[in-house]
């Protein structure tokens, strides 16, 4: 498979793309046409072409920071660089980097210092995600991770700390606020905000009644309007407004973090790793499965859009129809993300060389065919590709078990 990866990377290098291999020097900016990226100050075009990285032998979910081994990481980055990878996306974890809401852990930051130095030497730039749950869930995420003031203040502190520490660092391509954020359907503490949002939208109860008609009960007022049931119901105005309210909460979550980052680090790009059902094509029968993070809304605060995609409309190799349907789905999702800013396919891929849990066995050649098909199908609608994951992961419970660019023993597929 990696003959194809190396070939594609070689083509990018010949096409005037910022250097493949060698130490990282200049920072990356959005190009003047808003369609891609350039290296500063050279002006060379930069196409992020790489993978999502974690050490494949640190368990599942991977404990990349608790079991951090700089020698192993350096070996992995050397392999990636040799394959033509110029970008790696890496998760930061809340329980390791910020177990206490009031401070960011210095020991964890020193590990990140070491990883950034490795990346800089290898020529592989980094997309670093905001604090996630892989190594545990901190107490301050409760009761409300996305709209609770305690959790939001912790995020403010996290980004101000990292922004100040790594401002201007050329090895960092971008900050990714969070991997695949997804709002819950309802949190009890949202009730006052829901009432205020409705009042701002409709101004008077008469206007709300006119819009909702019989859906609004006589006893309901701004402070007592109930959220809808998590049940699909076409043309239900309460359900529509609730989804718009959830999007509003997601807007505020994105805006606040971006402002915290910009205050201490105006030098790096910012994005969000959107889950693919941020575009509500699948799972429409269950309203809560809509993530409420909408790239067409939240892109106003971001420098580029980062969308994730896996083949959910049937398995690609079960039929030509499933193959074609999934590629059309990919193109549709990416086209939806176009708002005048670059679009990166931040996770994609499939598996080969075995059979993950509950999935049929596929060969490495079949994995290669699908990855190449995804790249070819998306070339007109995206400007970067990061496969999932770097290496086959023995303890994985999903396609990551055989989804790597390399095998678990680090030999090339």
Give short role names for the model-derived ranges.
Residues 335, 360-379:
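Surface-exposed substrate-engagement region within the catalytic domains
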Residues 7-16:
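Bacterial N-terminal signal peptides
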Residues 18-20:
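Boundary at the C-terminal end of the N-terminal hydrophobic targeting segment
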Residues 273, 344-347:
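Active-site neighborhood of phospho(di)ester-bond hydrolases with catalytic His/Asp-centered motifs
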Residues 175, 179, 307, 346-347:
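Active-site flanking residues adjacent to catalytic metal/cofactor-binding acidic residues
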């Amino acid at each position: 498979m990696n003959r194809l990866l190396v070939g594609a990377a070689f083509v990018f290098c010949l096409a005037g793309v910022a250097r493949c291999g060698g130490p990282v020097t200049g920072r990356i900016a959005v190009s003047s046409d808003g369609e891609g990226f350039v290296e500063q100050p050279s002006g060379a075009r930069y196409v992020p072409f790489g993978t999502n990285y974690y050490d494949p032998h640190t368990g599942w979910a991977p404990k990349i920071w608790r079991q951090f081994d700089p020698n192993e990481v350096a070996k992995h980055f050397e392999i990636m660089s040799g394959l033509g990878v110029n970008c790696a996306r890496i998760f930061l974890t809340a329980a390791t980097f910020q177990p206490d809401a009031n401070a960011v852990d210095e020991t964890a930051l020193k590990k990140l210092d070491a990883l950034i130095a490795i990346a800089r030497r290898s020529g592989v730039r980094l997309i670093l995600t905001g604090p996630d749950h892989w190594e545990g869930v901190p107490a301050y995420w409760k009761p409300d991770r996305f709209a609770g003031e305690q959790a939001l203040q912790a995020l403010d502190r996290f980004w101000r700390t990292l922004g100040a520490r790594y401002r201007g660092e050329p090895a960092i391509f971008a900050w990714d606020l969070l991997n695949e954020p997804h709002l819950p359907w309802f949190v009890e503490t949202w009730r006052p905000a829901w009432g205020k949002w409705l009042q701002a939208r409709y101004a008077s109860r008469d206007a709300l009644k006119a819009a909702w008609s019989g859906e609004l009960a006589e006893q309901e007022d701004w402070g007592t309007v109930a959220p809808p049931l998590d049940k699909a119901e076409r043309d239900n105005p309460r359900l529509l407004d609730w989804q718009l309210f959830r999007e509003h909460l997601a807007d505020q979550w994105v805006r606040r973090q971006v402002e915290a980052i910009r205050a201490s680090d105006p030098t790096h790009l910012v994005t969000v790793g959107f889950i693919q059902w941020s575009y509500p094509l699948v799972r429409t029968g269950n309203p809560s499965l809509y993530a409420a993070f909408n790239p067409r809304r939240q892109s106003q605060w971001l420098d580029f859009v980062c969308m994730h995609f896996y083949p959910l409309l049937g398995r690609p190799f079960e039929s030509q129809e499933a193959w074609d349907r999934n590629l059309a789905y990919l193109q549709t999702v990416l086209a939806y993300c176009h708002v005048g800013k670059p679009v990166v396919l931040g996770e994609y891929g499939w598996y080969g060389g075995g059979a993950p849990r509950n999935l049929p066995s596929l060969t490495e050649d079949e994995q290669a065919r699908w990855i190449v098909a995804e790249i070819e199908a998306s070339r007109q609608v995206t400007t970067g590709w990061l496969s999932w994951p770097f290496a086959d992961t023995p303890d994985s419970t999903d396609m990551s078990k055989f989804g790597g660019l390399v095998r678990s023993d680090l030999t090339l597929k």
